[in-house]
Regions:
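C-terminal cap/substrate-recognition subdomain and adjoining C-terminal extension
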Residues: 1-5, 91-98, 102-236
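Hydrophobic alpha-helical segments and their boundary regions
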Residues: 40, 76-78, 215
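Active-site neighborhood of HAD-like aspartate-dependent phosphohydrolases
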Residues: 1-58
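Short, charged N-terminal helix-start/capping segments
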Residues: 33-68, 118-149
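Short linear elements at protein peripheries
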Residues: 25-26, 49-107, 111-118, 123-125
């Protein structure tokens, strides 16, 4: 028998006003793990992928089509850009991610969001965290919330060293919908009875895949879409 599930975006949905990656960067800079060279590398990679700096095609990470100018810039220089990780050891990053969770994420974790997660778990609905953030950044939160699944960006690792690339397309926009549909098929989730929570208009494909979409702290575009479609709106 198929069963409903609950899907949560993380950044600015469960974590208020910021992202797991921003929290990680703050912690890494504070501890001297990431210096100016890493940030300049990220800047250069972003310029390359925007076509504003020379680079062979294989060195450019793809930017989703149809993004607004400011969203495109954010994607190019942070959310889709992992060049700053190049050369770091995976184990060290996992340890740093746990420190970032304790120091930066927990104080910003929505109390109401935690209550909603717990209520869905108590109702027997598996909780799936589906996020564009890196998997090792999401794992401490998955453990803390006792979520059943974490679907996240997977960094490429060679001999224990991060390359600054992802192994699969970045979970963003339409790609998040594809991942939701895939896990639903694999696990036998009834999407018409399932819930999804997200904050950004690029999450519309993700939200409209379930019977109970919820716009959380929505940006102006998502708020308008949610109001037009009669979706639930909440502020955490």
């Amino acid at each position: 028998m198929m069963k409903p599930a609950t899907f949560f975006d993380i950044d600015r949905t469960l974590v208020v006003g910021t992202s797991l990656e921003t929290c990680f960067l703050r912690t890494a800079q504070r501890r001297g793990v990431l210096g100016p060279a890493a940030l300049l590398r990220n800047l250069w990679a972003g310029l390359q992928s925007l076509g504003l700096a020379p680079a062979p095609p294989e060195d450019r990470f793809p930017i989703p089509a149809g993004l607004a100018f400011t969203t495109r810039l954010r994607y190019a220089f942070l959310s889709g850009n992992k060049a700053y990780l190049r050369g770091l050891r995976w184990e060290a990053c996992a340890v740093l991610a746990e420190a970032a969770f304790q120091e930066e994420v927990l104080p910003r974790l929505s109390a109401q969001g935690q209550e909603v997660v717990a209520a869905h778990r108590a109702a027997g609905r598996p909780v799936v965290l589906l996020t564009g953030t890196l998997d090792f950044l999401g794992e401490p939160l998955q453990r803390y919330l006792k979520a059943s699944h974490l679907l996240a960006a997977r960094p490429e690792v060679h001999d224990g060293i991060l390359t600054g690339r992802l192994t699969e397309p970045h979970p963003y926009g339409e790609r998040k919908r594809e991942m939701l549909l895939q896990v639903a098929e694999e696990r036998g989730f009834d999407l018409t009875a399932s819930y999804a929570y997200a904050d950004h208009h690029t999450d519309v494909p993700f939200l409209e895949s379930v019977g109970h979409p919820v716009a959380v702290n929505p940006d102006s575009k998502l708020r308008q879409i949610a109001e037009e479609r009669g979706w639930e709106l909440v502020e955490w």
